[in-house]
Amino acid sequence: PTRRSSDLSVPGKLFIAGEYAVVEPGHPAIIVAVDQFINVTIEGARKNGSIQSAQYSDLPIRWTRRNGELVLDHRENPFHYILAAIRLTEKYAQEKGTLLSFYDLKVTSELDNSNGRKYGLGSSGAVTVATVKALNLYYDLKMDRLTQFKIAALAHLAVQGNGSCGDIAASCYGGWLAFSTFDHEWVLRKQQEWT
């Protein structure tokens, strides 16, 4: 099926208070989305797809599918957060009966400098959210923001293993947020039960 393209930006974050306390469930933080963005563009492709980011080289890394799984044509993979977001979003899409397709995904960022040095504005969280949101548009999944947050949080935790996901919330919802994290142990138990 023909897919439309998607192009969107999500903001980075800045913790105002509670950056360390919020790692524990029930402890709040105040977070603000900043006017620095990550942009993800997705364009339909035919035989294989690609992922490209100026932070890791201007050359795209090609990918294909094997047994329904996305497989990169590259030994060193700098796109862990993007791939985790793709895998979980596409799993959601398949559960909704959506046929998967190939596409070229391009990332540009204002959250790192030109040398790839991070400013601490939540670039890994922002690229995870931007990927989920772009695929939501590309596949026309009609996810609400809470579903986008949940998928992005699970993808981020799959790569990082810990963290409050406050950066995910800021990139997902924007503006000023009072945020408390969820019980990661409960989520881990549920994931183990369902797999």
Segments (PLM) and residue ranges:
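ATP-binding N-lobe of GHMP and related small-molecule kinases
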Residues: 6-121, 133-143, 174
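Short, small-residue-biased leader/transition segments that mark boundaries at the very start
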Residues: 1-5
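Alpha/beta catalytic cores of group-transfer enzymes, especially the acyltransferase/condensing modules
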Residues: 143-192
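Active-site signature of alpha/beta-hydrolase-fold catalytic machinery across serine-
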Residues: 130
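Charged, glycine/proline-rich intrinsically disordered loops and linkers
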Residues: 64-69, 187-195
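Short, conserved phosphate/pyrophosphate- and ester-handling motifs at nucleotide-, phospho-/glycolipid
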Residues: 124
